[in-house]
Amino acid sequence: MNGEEQYYAATQLYKDPCAFQRGPAPEFSASPPACLYMGRQPPPPPPHPFPGALGALEQGSPPDISPYEVPPLADDPAVAHLHHHLPAQLALPHPPAGPFPEGAEPGVLEEPNRVQLPFPWMKSTKAHAWKGQWAGGAYAAEPEENKRTRTAYTRAQLLELEKEFLFNKYISRPRRVELAVMLNLTERHIKIWFQNRRMKWKKEEDKKRGGGTAVGGGGVAEPEQDCAVTSGEELLALPPPPPPGGAVPPAAPVAAREGRLPPGLSASPQPSSVAPRRPQEPR
């Protein structure tokens, strides 16, 4: 019961924090009373409901728990060894900081300072071949270890590929996978082979077409048309001799349509004055 009475008495005391500060206040105060600020603050937590347990803890630790004693660092042999070598290292003079070491020329760089290619796959390409010929020499020409070699096809593989190309100039993806499994090749090898084979086939076709047009198909040249027949002026200047019997030359109708006929010729054929001879009957 004593604990409960102390608890309730404490709570009543904390309910009115200004109880001990009530008194005659001065008429003119420079600042408001402190109880106003104390009233705004949250009340402190109530005391522990079991004061006996707290008192036991405050008295001390149980006798069976002994405090841990930390050994001094000087007794540790490893720490003593470090202390033995530490002054010697601190006594070493620091090298002078400068842009270049002593005895080195500014234009010469050391081997570890050379710029290396960051990725190994960059060695397999020829994109950095110019660095070996550069006068600066910062980039050293490295041998191309991972250079891609040319694929050597066997006769059986070439035979199957040629047979497939004979039927299909453009291979499909499922058929390409099937050929890759059957011929023990990759899809990329088959794709590249078909691309090269198509280019070769197109060149052969172009060569065949070019040879046929140069010969002229059957190898027979077409006769050229005479320009004197199509020109009417040249026909008037050089009239052909009339054939016997007064027949009109074949070029006369063309000249008659144009309205230009040589003298002695007419558009219509004239009857011959000489009658044809009849064959004599046998007696």
Curated annotation (Swiss-Prot):
Residue window of motif Antp-type hexapeptide: 118-123
Segments of this protein annotated with the region Transactivation domain: 13-73
Domain of life according to the entry: Eukaryota
Cell compartment(s), UniProt: Nucleus; Cytoplasm, Cytosol
InterPro entries in alphabetical order: HD, HD_metazoa, Homeobox_antennapedia, Homeobox_CS, Homeodomain-like_sf
Main subcellular location: nucleus
One Pfam family here: Homeodomain
Single Gene Ontology BP annotation: insulin secretion
Record-listed Phosphothreonine modification sites: T151
Region (Disordered): 34-71, 201-283
Feature: DNA-binding region: 146-205
UniProt-reported outcome of changing R197H: Risk factor for type 2 diabetes
Biased composition range(s): Pro residues: 41-50, 238-252
Positions with biased composition (Gly residues): 211-220
Post-translational modification: Phosphorylated by the SAPK2 pathway at high intracellular glucose concentration. Phosphorylated by HIPK2 on Ser-268 upon glucose accumulation. This phosphorylation mediates subnuclear localization shifting. Phosphorylation by PASK may lead to translocation into the cytosol.
Tissues in which the UniProt entry reports expression: Duodenum and pancreas (Langerhans islet beta cells and small subsets of endocrine non-beta-cells, at low levels in acinar cells).
Modified residues (Phosphoserine): S268
UniProt GO MF annotations: DNA-binding transcription activator activity, RNA polymerase II-specific; DNA-binding transcription factor activity; DNA-binding transcription factor activity, RNA polymerase II-specific; promoter-specific chromatin binding; protein-containing complex binding; RNA polymerase II cis-regulatory region sequence-specific DNA binding; RNA polymerase II-specific DNA-binding transcription factor binding; sequence-specific double-stranded DNA binding
Comment block on domains: The Antp-type hexapeptide mediates heterodimerization with PBX on a regulatory element of the somatostatin promoter.
Disease affiliated with this protein: Pancreatic agenesis 1: A disease characterized by isolated hypoplasia or agenesis of the pancreas, pancreatic beta-cell failure resulting in neonatal insulin-dependent diabetes mellitus, and exocrine pancreatic insufficiency.
Family: Belongs to the Antp homeobox family. IPF1/XlHbox-8 subfamily.
Extra facts: According to PubMed:16141209, it may be methylated by SETD7 in vitro. However, the relevance of methylation is unsure in vivo.
Binding partners and assembly: Interacts with the basic helix-loop-helix domains of TCF3(E47) and NEUROD1 and with HMG-I(Y). Interacts with SPOP. Interacts with the methyltransferase SETD7. Part of a PDX1:PBX1b:MEIS2b complex.
Functional note: Activates insulin, somatostatin, glucokinase, islet amyloid polypeptide and glucose transporter type 2 gene transcription. Particularly involved in glucose-dependent regulation of insulin gene transcription. As part of a PDX1:PBX1b:MEIS2b complex in pancreatic acinar cells is involved in the transcriptional activation of the ELA1 enhancer; the complex binds to the enhancer B element and cooperates with the transcription factor 1 complex (PTF1) bound to the enhancer A element. Binds preferentially the DNA motif 5'-[CT]TAAT[TG]-3'.
Protein name as catalogued: Pancreas/duodenum homeobox protein 1
Organism (species): Homo sapiens (Human)
UniProt lineage: Eukaryota, Metazoa, Chordata, Craniata, Vertebrata
